[in-house]
């Protein structure tokens, strides 16, 4: 049998709470900077992930196309450096919701997802620690995220999914890489 050794070092760079810019290109630039500064080597099994929300501002003209263009540029930059992007659309909290239910319902924004999430986590706050409430449901969340992905693939979307694919999250890929 194979003995798996894991050395996981998770760093959060460029989060809103740290005052960092959170647009896709800025997140990738910060990841590249971190990767270079810390001599992270994809060829030696290291990985760098950028976790991003859809965060569509529907007040902008043609918001989906504008956001998709930025995402496409970020993906090209990330691919060139071996960086993975985990997207959650419309927001990260959709991943949390999948711990409790499967849904393909369109969610316009964070408040819409939070409203659904509070059915299961009534006191949910964005900066709160919900790990203990979610941990035992991780396998369900992974299964539900894969089902959402299959739903979109069967409905004429193709990977990598863009911002028009809502709801969606591939956070499960990051989580599976840590398990």
Regions found by a protein language model. Give the residues of each.
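C-terminal accessory helical subdomains adjacent to catalytic cores in phosphodiester-
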Residues: 2-15, 32-49, 54-179
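Short phosphate-binding loop-to-helix
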Residues: 19-33
């Amino acid at each position: 049998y194979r003995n798996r050794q894991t050395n996981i070092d998770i760093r959060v760079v460029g989060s809103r709470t740290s005052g960092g810019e959170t647009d896709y290109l800025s997140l990738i630039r910060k990841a590249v900077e971190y990767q270079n500064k810390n001599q992270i080597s994809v060829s030696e099994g290291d990985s760098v992930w950028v976790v991003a929300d859809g965060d569509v501002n529907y007040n902008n003209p043609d918001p989906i196309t504008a956001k998709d263009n930025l995402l496409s540029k970020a993906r090209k930059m990330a691919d060139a450096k071996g960086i993975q992007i985990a997207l959650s659309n419309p927001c990260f909290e959709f991943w949390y919701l999948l711990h409790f239910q499967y849904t393909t319902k369109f969610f316009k924004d964070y408040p819409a997802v939070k409203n659904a999430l509070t059915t299961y986590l009534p006191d949910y706050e964005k900066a709160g620690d919900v790990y203990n409430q979610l941990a035992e449901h991780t396998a369900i969340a992974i299964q539900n995220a894969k089902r959402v992905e299959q739903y979109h693939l069967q409905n004429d979307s193709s990977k990598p999914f863009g911002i028009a694919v809502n709801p969606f999250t591939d956070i499960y890929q990051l989580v599976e890489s840590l398990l």
